[in-house]
Curated annotation (Swiss-Prot):
<comment type="function">
    <text>Shows cytolytic activity on many different cells by forming pore in lipid membranes. In vivo, increases heart rate or kills the animal by cardiac arrest. In addition, it binds to heparin with high affinity, interacts with Kv channel-interacting protein 1 (KCNIP1) in a calcium-independent manner, and binds to integrin alpha-V/beta-3 (ITGAV/ITGB3) with moderate affinity. Preferentially binds acidic phospholipids like phosphatidylserine, phosphatidic acid and phosphatidyl glycerol.</text>
</comment>
<keyword id="KW-1015">Disulfide bond</keyword>
<keyword id="KW-0964">Secreted</keyword>
<feature type="disulfide bond">
    <location>
        <begin position="14"/>
        <end position="38"/>
    </location>
</feature>
<dbReference type="InterPro" id="IPR045860">
    <property type="entry name" value="Snake_toxin-like_sf"/>
</dbReference>
<dbReference type="GO" id="GO:0090729">
    <property type="term" value="F:toxin activity"/>
</dbReference>
<dbReference type="GO" id="GO:0016020">
    <property type="term" value="C:membrane"/>
</dbReference>
<protein>
    <recommendedName>
        <fullName>Cytotoxin 7</fullName>
    </recommendedName>
</protein>
<keyword id="KW-1052">Target cell membrane</keyword>
<comment type="similarity">
    <text>Belongs to the three-finger toxin family. Short-chain subfamily. Type IA cytotoxin sub-subfamily.</text>
</comment>
<keyword id="KW-0123">Cardiotoxin</keyword>
<comment type="subunit">
    <text>Monomer in solution; Homodimer and oligomer in the presence of negatively charged lipids forming a pore with a size ranging between 20 and 30 Angstroms.</text>
</comment>
<keyword id="KW-1053">Target membrane</keyword>
<dbReference type="InterPro" id="IPR003571">
    <property type="entry name" value="Snake_3FTx"/>
</dbReference>
<feature type="disulfide bond">
    <location>
        <begin position="3"/>
        <end position="21"/>
    </location>
</feature>
<keyword id="KW-0472">Membrane</keyword>
<dbReference type="InterPro" id="IPR054131">
    <property type="entry name" value="Toxin_cobra-type"/>
</dbReference>
């Protein structure tokens, strides 16, 4: 699986066991992601932070 880094022009290949890509946003500003990468389990959203997870190459 390949996941985009913070700047989508760059990406990395995920290590074994991390088979989801994610994008993290601040709830107050959903237009600008603050973090992207590989993850094993999609975190729950909170009052401040929203996560979007997916499982295809560079989907984040």
């Amino acid at each position: 699986l390949k996941c985009n880094k913070l700047i989508p022009l760059a990406y990395k290949t995920c290590p074994a066991g991390k088979d989801l890509c994610y994008k993290m946003y601040m709830v107050s500003n959903k237009t600008v992601p603050v973090k992207r990468g590989c993850i094993d389990v999609c975190p729950k959203n909170s009052l401040l932070v929203k996560y979007e997870c997916c499982n295809t190459d560079r989907c984040n």
